[in-house]
Each structure stands twice: as C-alpha cells, then as structure tokens.
A protein has these predicted regions:
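Long, contiguous binding/interaction regions
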Residues: 1-154
C-alpha cells in the first residue's frame, strides 16, 4: 500500500561530485515514477551541512553534525590530503509510494556501484529513512510531504 516515507543520504564530497549524485538520484526517481506504483510522487532537496536535521524540532543537530563520521572517514582514507571544497550535504527525498528498500538500495548504488570493492568510495556516504511508524513521524512526513499524496489523489 502506498504511503509517505523519506530517504536520506548524507554525502561528503566536492560540489561537482555531490551535484552529479543529486542529478543521478533525480533520474532514478523519475524512472521509478514512470513505473508506478513504486514511486507515485517524490520531492528531492539538497540540504547544506549548517541546516538542522529536522526543521522545527527541539533537536539542535545540524546535518554536518549528523554525518560527522563522513569527513573523518575521508581523512582516514586519504591521509595527509587536503579536503579542498568537500562539504557535507544531505539529500532528503520524500516519496509517496512503495518500495522503500528497493529505492534505498538503488540510491546507495549511485554512490557505491560495487558494494564489495576493496578501495574507498570517492564520496563517503550514509543512508537512512523515515517511516510513518508513530504519530510523531507521521506528522513530520505529512507536514513535509503530504502534498505528494494530494497531487496523486486529485
């Protein structure tokens, strides 16, 4: 049954690399939306590191703080190298549809096409998701992505 959910992908990379991954994510979602019901409607936002992880929440955690392990991972994998213009961002993807696990796996493969590789990923990444499993998260999803449901119900 279709419902609202949110996929989150933290990235630590140069602007060109994170923009490329963002474009690939949009293409993936477009492809899936043409093959409904997996993705009936979606919205993607690129959130800078200085923004809160959950707007309006009492939590004061920023996106950079949430993904603080990503710059550290990069430094460990590139000892002595300068990070240049790398920064932490989060791709926040609201979805009205089904297939959370499939989408999360495919999103992960955009950043890391070969999960069993022995070298470091060019752009360190981390994924997570939000489901409407209680009143708090259902309200969060409705407030941010309820318009996706309304688009499809009209």
């Amino acid at each position: 049954m279709a419902d609202l959910f949110e996929l989150r992908m933290g990235l630590y990379g140069a602007e060109a690399a994170t923009e490329e991954l963002t474009d690939k994510a949009r293409s993936l979602l477009d492809e899936h939306s043409r093959r409904a019901p997996i993705v009936r409607a979606w919205a993607l936002s690129s959130i800078p590191g200085d923004q809160p992880t959950e707007p309006g929440s009492e939590e004061e955690l920023t996106v950079s703080e949430l993904y603080e392990e990503l710059p550290e991972q990069w430094r460990l994998e590139h000892p002595g190298a300068e990070p240049g213009d790398r920064r932490v961002i989060e791709l926040r993807i609201g979805v009205y549809g089904d297939g959370l696990r499939e989408l999360l796996d495919e999103l992960s493969r955009l950043a890391c096409p070969e999960p069993e590789h022995s070298s470091a990923c060019p752009v360190p990444w981390s994924t997570n998701f939000t489901l409407p499993f209680d009143d708090h998260y259902r309200a969060y999803l409705e407030a941010h992505y309820g318009h996706l449901r309304r688009i499809m119900d009209t």
